[in-house]
Amino acid sequence: MPEILKIKPTRMELLKLKRRVKLAERGHKLLKEKQDALIMEFFTIYDEALSLRRELIKKMEEAFEALRRAQVDVGSLRLKEISIGVKPNEEIEIRTRNIMGVRVPLIEVPELKRKASDRGYAFISTTSTVDVAAEKFEEVLELAIRLAEVEESLKRLGKEIEKTKRRVNALEYIIIPRMKNTIKFIEQHLDEMERENFFRLKRVKAILEARQSM
């Protein structure tokens, strides 16, 4: 006999166990639906992450090429002086949103693309190549922040998928089969008890009839 639960083999326990099996099967169905929905959401975001990563690589190549041109145009020393005068970007705000019960980051980013005058180096003589390089790196920063949000979402969804999968498997391969094996065991036990009682009563009846015929 496969592994069973340690409970009394009574009719009351049998009824309770049958109710528990129904609840467990309902729970398994809901968890499986959640797991499937999470996996679909995961791959939707995964596709977005791949697209963002490709775009980020392209933008980084463009940004470093623009930086190289700016260095050629104004020189490394002047470029360093200009960079010292650049104002920092506004702070980003990180909130969360809910995806199938999973809290994932929602990064609210202020406008990162700025006019040359807003960058803080307007007082220094610059050229269009410097402005182009600055603009390209602002685009890189926007994409990098978005990619960070998406990749963290993937990480959290992946953890939840694994957690849900473990629960689904536990119900499907351990808990529900164990309860069903126990139900089968109790039913067999009760049938055996019933047969024994039947033969016992039959024997008692035969003894009583034999005594009455004397």
UniProtKB/Swiss-Prot annotation:
It comes from Pyrococcus abyssi (strain GE5 / Orsay). HAMAP family: ATP_synth_D_arch. InterPro entries: V_ATPase_D (IPR002699). This is A-type ATP synthase subunit D. Belongs to the V-ATPase D subunit family. Its main location: membrane. It comes from the Archaea. It is found in: Cell membrane.
